[in-house]
A protein has these predicted regions:
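Positively charged, solvent-exposed patches that mediate nucleic-acid binding
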Residues: 33, 43, 91-92, 114-115
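Acidic active-site catalytic centers that drive phospho-/nucleotidyl reactions
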Residues: 11, 36-38, 52-54, 99
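Acidic-basic catalytic patches of nuclease active cores, encompassing PD-(D/E)XK
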Residues: 1-28
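Active-site metal-binding core of divalent-cation-utilizing nuclease and nuclease-like domains
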Residues: 24-48
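Short, low-complexity, polybasic intrinsically disordered segments
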Residues: 103-115
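Conserved catalytic cores of phosphodiester-cleaving nucleases, focusing on short active-site segments
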Residues: 39-41, 45-60, 77
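Catalytic cores of nucleic-acid endonucleases
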Residues: 55-104
Length: 115
């Protein structure tokens, strides 16, 4: 399986997980000149969630997850979100959170507020 197909399958698993948790999926693979957001969702309590999806060959310890997204990637995600919000999104949210979801052997682990 190529990297693009694997990534798409992992993002589908995470999207399904988020929907079961009460999220509304707003965008998948939102792209702009600044970068890409894997999944943008709105939680049932009004939190706008930017989720970076990582496919792993092994499970990581919870304290290792924060190292999966470096400073450059964080900046690109924030600029991409700013671009999305400036483009006229028509939904209301209470706050914004940046999360990481890992997928190992079709198992989703979701880390809230990792960066």
């Amino acid at each position: 399986m190529d990297k693009k197909t694997k990534g798409s399958e992992c993002e589908s698993l995470v999207s399904e997980y988020l929907q079961r948790e009460g999220h509304t999926i707003l965008e998948r693979n939102y792209r702009c000149p600044f970068g890409e957001i894997d999944i943008l969702s709105l939680s049932s309590d009004g939190v706008l969630c930017v989720t970076e999806v990582k496919s792993l060959t092994r499970r990581w310890a919870a304290d290792e997850v924060r190292y999966m997204v470096d400073g450059r990637k964080m900046m690109r995600l924030k600029k991409t979100l700013e671009h999305y919000l400036a483009s006229g999104s028509k939904f209301r949210y209470n706050s914004i959170r940046f999360d990481v979801a890992t997928v190992t052997d079709a198992h989703v682990t979701y880390y809230r507020g990792e960066f």
